[in-house]
Amino acid sequence: MAIPTSLSLFPASPSSPPKPILAAPVKPSCVTVRFKNGGGLSAGEDLPLDYETWLPKRDVKNRRRAGILLHPTSLPGPFGIGDLGPQAFQFVDWLHDAGCSLWQVLPLVPPGRRADEEGSPYSGQDANCGNTLLISLEELVKMVYCQRKSFQNHSVADIKDPLVAENNIFVISGWLEDAAYFAAIDDTLNTFSWYDWPDPLKNRHLAALEEIYQSKKEFIDIFIAQQFLFQRQWQKVHDYARMKGINIMGDMPIYVGYHSADVWANKKQFLLNGSGFPLLVSGVPPDAFSETGQLWNSPLYDWKAMERDGFSWWVRRMRRAQNLFDDFRIDHFRGFAGFWAVPSEAKVATVGRWKVGPGKSLFDAIFRAVGDINIIAEDLGVITEDVVQLRRSIGAPGMAVLQFGFGSDAENPHLPHNHEQNQVVYTGTHDNDTIRGWWDILPQEEKSNVVKYLGNIVEEDISWELIQAALSSVAKTAIIPMQDVLGLGSSARMNIPATQVKKHAYAYCRPTQVLYLKSARNGNSGMELLRLKLSIHALVNDFI
């Protein structure tokens, strides 16, 4: 019944008589079932014989899925690290056979080359280029052989024109041209950073760039050709994964390295002084990983300048990510709401302070230019209310990590009963120890919490106990590091955050013990495949 408009929240004055409330005329109730063809049935009439088949359709976006975190460098390969060759395709087959539908990789960018970066893909030399170390020589030989055979049956124009057309797509990409010139100058001068280059090159004077082009033309052509080969091989792997029903999730660091084409070619988009040196650098305050915080030393964005430019730099970056991946995780998502800014001369991150990020205006600009994109927000660490609201406003799932769940109380957001459907749950990320390594040094109190929460567990099988917990979560996506599937210890850990130089080597390129690919027909690897397949089918596929 509608509420009469004369109804007031305040009592009528006692001196005035109460006004009568007139009831609205009552209409006869009638329930009508409408059909797609426009017809209908009234209450009490017979329903069609197929009525029991009118089941609600589930939204495909809410489909539960499971995946594996494994960087391509951890695949087996004859040259020290994995690549985009046959083993990458075999891994896709393995994912398909296991019932997985997602493969997460770390950033595919060229890794940092400085000593303090230890080859980290999170301090890459370029935000858009591919890591050419991933180019498979075996696939390259196959491609050359196939092209040579084609020459026997076709004219030169038939072969050359399509290849030139494909290559020109890359040549006209602004980011690739910037990266090629940057690499050519860097190869010529070999300084610590572009800040030390002569002013004409440092400030991109056209005459100086033309001189570099003339003197380093072969280098520039080879650089572009290598990126073309990377793109071609990656696209082949990506297309094969899609054919097998596997989405590939990339990883996008929020910041870029100072010694990069991104900063050199876009100085006005960063907080630099008049000579090009950073005013403020990135980091995070003290947290669970470090008592003094983490000093990342990446230059910070000039968000006001970026907004005036329509966030065009970010739009280009997102378009490139769309070209490479089906989904992608944005590392340190909280920096879009509020970011930690540290003076560039500081030695520790504790002297920084919080500053306001671009917020939803950045994503509004991206969505207008790019359309819908599948973002996963890395929302770990110090997560304030504005970060939560920003993530929800763009519909991006956050993250939960089981290893973080057992050290406090029942309100811990990483415990399974606190998970959300629109979330991605991990046993651990690349920054965590493996489950086996984590368990070996876990304080007894936390071990007791794990046992109480998960029930009767077998400690020798702790990796699989947590894998089962992740797959059982209400979160619609679960991702398991390959090291945990194999039950490996701390020696297989990918990274140790906030560790000082020379105390560790960034192990992202250490080949994992991938026995699952080498001997899938017998031994432990075959059993692990069967076990993962049964777990995923029981806990994911049967309940979508």
Task: Show the residue positions of the predicted features.
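N-terminal regions that are enriched for targeting/export leaders
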Residues: 24-73, 83-89
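Alpha-amylase-like alpha-glycosidases and glucanotransferases acting on alpha-linked glucans and related
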Residues: 57-64, 71, 115-231, 255-479, ...
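Surface-exposed amphipathic alpha-helices with a cationic face
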Residues: 96, 234-242, 367, 391-392
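Catalytic domains of carbohydrate-active enzymes, especially glycoside hydrolases
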Residues: 54, 59-61, 86-111, 320-327, ...
